[in-house]
């Protein structure tokens, strides 16, 4: 959980800055604010394009040399890229070189995170006791809300003491304060490396090595023998990603925008920090339900709830009637649902694949879903709300949730599977 918390902290630090900082410091200042925001989101989405590549690279080594060593590499890749973002010059200083360097670092972040999640999930699932695999696997999932809490909490502290006005680039926060969360990641990475070096390799992988079942080319093998689970896992995961980046990144940009809800940035960060506790609470609940009621039935019910949630966007977020109270309710409900759908995924996706390609297969499904769900969600939602209104964003979530529901209904129940036999 420590490693995934650090990885997600690094990722969310960028996501927050993509809304409040980068449109003004890394893209031409004469742009329309919406254009600058869309450009920032485009760079934001670049990491998601890198994530499947990261899952292929790190998945190869994870299935060949082991889960432990590969996770050290993924953490270093993410940590170094995040630290370097904190040192980048701005557009005003070096022109077009600034967004180019930002995009490169964001790409490297994506590579690191692409190899992180599946390795952490496998460490949990391949060491869990019988009947408690989803419960064990939910611990790495807690890294997502804890990383988000740390990233946004630090931004909140900085904004409180240094000040921030949306669009203002002269204040202390926009001049140098925004760099602090990126630079501090180096300390967290050192802690994460200490933890990772003390880990033991999973018994399931050791057994695969002893029996000579390692794949020589995991990427080739997974597409040859497990292409159906690849497709299924991708669509099972896609609504989870879409929901999360709608109720975090997109809603932050919409909430603080003058042509949106015009809530002060500091106030909106507070609302997000309160709501994240619903995410933390619902992940263990989902893990318990997935072990007792089954993965499939749990995910079907949560998907139906997510579809219903899509119909509430207009009620909670319409500019004419929305208040901070209604936004807090929206965020809290959205985060609670997010935990319910995200919690079982670290058990479900690895259970779809055999041991010799499990790192590669689960990683590809998880990270291709990040392109189809997370990478485009803020961009699509921003375009939809500007043309059709906030209700269209809810319809977008509904459509994606239906696609995931179909995939979940097609999958087999996996809670009784033996990880050494599949």
Language model features: what each stretch is:
Residues 135-160, 366-377:
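Glycine-rich segments within core transmembrane alpha-helices of 12-TM secondary carriers
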Residues 296-344:
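C-terminal transmembrane helical hairpin of 12-TM major facilitator-type secondary transporters
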Residues 55-67, 283-295:
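Helix-to-loop junctions at the C-terminal end of transmembrane segments
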Residues 192-199, 400-422:
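Multi-pass alpha-helical transporter architecture, strongest
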Residues 18-51:
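Extracellular/periplasmic helix-loop-helix junction of adjacent transmembrane segments
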Residues 15-16, 227-279, 373-377:
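Extracytoplasmic gate region of multi-pass secondary transporters
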Residues 28, 76-95, 304-321:
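C-terminal ends and interior cores of transmembrane alpha-helices
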Residues 64-76, 292-304:
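Cytoplasmic membrane-interface "Motif A"-like loop-to-helix N-cap segments
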